Amino acid sequence: DDICISIKDIEPQAPFHALIIPKKVITRVGEADNEDEPILGHLLITAKKIALEQGLKQGFRIVINNGSDGGETVPHLHVHLLGGRRLTWPPG
């Protein structure tokens, strides 16, 4: 759509693993501004819509990594959408 794109993760951690990426460059959620609030909300609603389209009715997980200790490896905010199996906790 006009705000974000979705792609499949190249190293999936679940049977379904997509990335929802805003078109606006936001380095990480920890650096988002108040003006980015509509974009952040849109990313979550888009993740929910994709999960329903993919038939993830039993549940799904949404993850945002922030900073090196949070597992961030790409300096552009993105949402991980994982599903298709029972996901355990803690994740890693």
Label the predicted regions.
Residues 1-92:
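HIT superfamily nucleotide-processing domains
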